[in-house]
């Protein structure tokens, strides 16, 4: 109720509000009810498509019906979520289409295309979100033909945008919001001026999402896609009018040469790029590769310009060539001040330049000039900081002048949950630490009968702990180990959630990164969460380094003002996976002795819910045994 009243007042008073609403508060209904009752147009934005679908498909319809309001709603995603009818048709005839098995998937999509109304690929049963077919049947800003497209009238993206412009409540996601802010392409730009009330759920992801989109990037993947599209379109529609093989080959060769400059030395890393050349690379070779790339793109642009009147495909390809050349030129020059530049090394290269935060961009929209109408923008999440001002969120988002509210959880954590810090594990930096964590986790999971999630701070630890746990239970008919990456995230969570009920086997899930947040496994399926280390940001990450330097230059402390708040928020998010309902019970284990012995440990422990502290391995085992005896799996769901 406290949050609902605050949101209602912010809407009436036309001012921005930041709300940290802990698990169990009823955050979604607390902002939806006052927003719907306002009678105004409302924009809702979430961090994930999963919550976007939940809001549009479940929460909004239920409330609109309960309140008996004549409200129309619409769902708007990025163009990559919708089937492109033109590209689907082209894919069937493209010689470069993936292996034969992909043709079966394409056939299913073609069959579904005849009956779908929305064209939202999330509605197609059995389509793996990682399917290699998806890029062939969806459009990007770069390859969309726009109004000249032969399928323009039936376009699912345009239909979704028209519905959004006509609706009273529109549900979007943060990626779409910032993509539009960067290039004004998604349709949100037309929507925002008509909306006074905007609500950002899962707002803790706004800053990191925003810096991705408000910066610039160029990848070898983009270059190879362009090269492939130019070759296919040139041979199909303008054969003989230019040497499309040579033009395409030159761009492809330049992209691969750029990748070869880096070689195999830095797999999966981000290279600092503070001067003309990324760290560790040969300056002359790097400059030469960029120069060759720029020349190949210019030649492609010139050739495409001569045939642009023949078909809309060539107009868009000509624009893409110019955009890619502009980005190549940008990265051949010194970086702009106030941002950070780096090189991501993987199967492809990604050249990135980004702002350090989104403060200016958000503040300009939330606090408009006096002559413009004041806006009621609401920002909410279960985790927005570890101080009363929620500085971790408000400072980088330009919201230090916004009103702030923190609403505590109604859960009785002292009764429902306990946490433990093991004393005898190797230090976090010791190479033996991951194996020791896995051995301890195996013992605890065996005692509990599964129902365990191990959250790691790095992908390396994910692999080490995952491999060790799988080896521990390799011959066990009573326990299975699921490791992130083995299947799509949603399928992995569902398998973990249902393991005990349907298979009669215990289950341990080992995961990293995105599994620290947004995972909801209530009841007995999850009763033990193990965190391998304190989740400090990686100190050698270029963005982390740049933010640290900025703080130090301003007289602050990078550790106290950046690393600790980041760790506190991440720890709070990870711990939040444990207790999701008033009937849940469980144990949190943090396998990092620094939490108990370092002075900053007290600050990090204050970020955790007020759980009972277990002081010995014996107490932990007693608690796990108690959970086993009082398992509530036979209770009806609440």
Question: What is the predicted function of each stretch?
Answer:
Residues 40-168, 175, 266, 296-303, ...:
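A substrate-engagement module of RecA-like helicase motors
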Residues 457-485:
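Conserved helicase motor "Helicase C" RecA-like lobe of SF1/SF2 P-loop NTPases
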């Amino acid at each position: 109720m406290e949050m609902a009243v605050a949101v209602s007042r912010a809407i009436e008073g036309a001012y921005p509000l930041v709300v940290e609403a802990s698990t169990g508060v009823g955050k979604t209904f607390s902002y939806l009810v006052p927003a719907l009752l306002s009678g105004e147009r409302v924009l809702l934005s979430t961090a994930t498509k999963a919550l976007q679908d939940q809001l549009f498909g479940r929460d909004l319809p239920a409330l609109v019906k309960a309140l008996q309001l004549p409200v129309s709603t619409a769902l708007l995603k990025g163009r990559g979520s919708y089937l492109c009818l033109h590209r689907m048709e082209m894919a069937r005839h493209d010689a470069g289409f993936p292996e034969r098995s992909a043709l079966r998937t394409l056939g299913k999509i073609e069959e579904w295309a005849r009956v779908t109304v929305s064209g939202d690929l999330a509605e197609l049963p059995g389509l793996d979100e990682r399917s290699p077919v998806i890029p062939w049947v969806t459009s990007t800003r770069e390859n969309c033909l726009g109004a000249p497209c032969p399928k323009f009238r039936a376009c699912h993206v345009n239909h979704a945008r028209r519905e959004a412009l006509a609706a009273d409540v529109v549900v979007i996601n943060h990626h779409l919001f910032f993509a539009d802010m960067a290039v004004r392409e998604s349709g949100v730009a037309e929507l925002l001026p008509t909306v006074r009330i905007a609500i950002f759920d899962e707002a803790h992801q706004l800053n990191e999402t925003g810096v991705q989109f408000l910066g610039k990037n160029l990848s070898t993947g983009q270059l190879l896609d362009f090269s492939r599209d130019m070759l296919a379109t040139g041979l199909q529609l303008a054969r003989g009018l230019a040497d499309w093989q040579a033009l395409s080959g030159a761009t492809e060769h330049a992209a691969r040469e750029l990748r070869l400059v880096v070689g195999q030395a830095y797999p999966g890393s981000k290279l600092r790029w503070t001067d003309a050349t990324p760290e560790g690379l040969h300056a002359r070779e790097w400059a030469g590769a960029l120069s060759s790339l720029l020349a190949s793109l210019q030649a492609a642009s010139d050739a495409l310009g001569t045939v642009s009147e023949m078909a809309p495909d060539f107009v868009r390809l000509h624009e893409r060539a110019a955009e890619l050349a502009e980005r190549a030129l940008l990265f051949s020059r010194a970086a702009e001040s106030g941002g950070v530049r780096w090189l991501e090394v993987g199967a492809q290269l990604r050249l990135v330049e980004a702002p350090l935060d989104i403060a200016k961009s958000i503040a300009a929209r939330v606090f408009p000039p006096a002559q413009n109408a004041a806006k009621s923008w609401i920002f909410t999440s279960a985790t927005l900081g570890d101080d009363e001002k929620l500085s971790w969120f408000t400072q980088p988002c330009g919201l230090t002048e916004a009103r702030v509210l923190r609403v505590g959880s109604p859960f009785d954590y002292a009764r429902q949950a306990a946490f433990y810090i093991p004393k005898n594990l190797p230090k976090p930096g010791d190479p033996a630490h991951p194996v020791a964590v896995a051995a301890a986790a195996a013992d605890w999971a065996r005692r509990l009968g599964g129902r365990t999630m191990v959250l790691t701070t790095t992908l390396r630890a994910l692999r080490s702990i995952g491999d060790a746990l799988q080896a521990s239970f390799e011959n066990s008919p009573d326990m299975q180990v699921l490791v992130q990456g083995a299947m799509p995230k949603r399928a992995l969570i569902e398998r973990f959630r249902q393991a005990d009920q349907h298979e009669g086997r215990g289950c341990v899930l080992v995961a990293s990164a995105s599994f620290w947040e947004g995972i909801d496994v209530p009841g007995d399926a999850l009763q033990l969460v193990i965190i391998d280390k304190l989740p400090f940001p990686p100190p050698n990450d270029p963005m982390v380094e740049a933010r640290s330097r900025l703080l130090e230059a301003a007289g602050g402390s990078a550790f106290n003002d950046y690393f600790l708040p980041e760790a506190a928020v991440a720890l709070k998010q990870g711990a939040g996976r444990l207790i999701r309902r008033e009937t849940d019970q469980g144990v949190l284990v943090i396998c990092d002795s620094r939490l108990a012995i370092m002075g900053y440990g007290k600050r990090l422990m204050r970020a955790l819910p007020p759980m009972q502290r277990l002081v010995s391995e014996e107490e932990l085992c007693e608690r796990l045994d108690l959970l086993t005896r009082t398992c509530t799996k036979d209770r009806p769901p609440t």
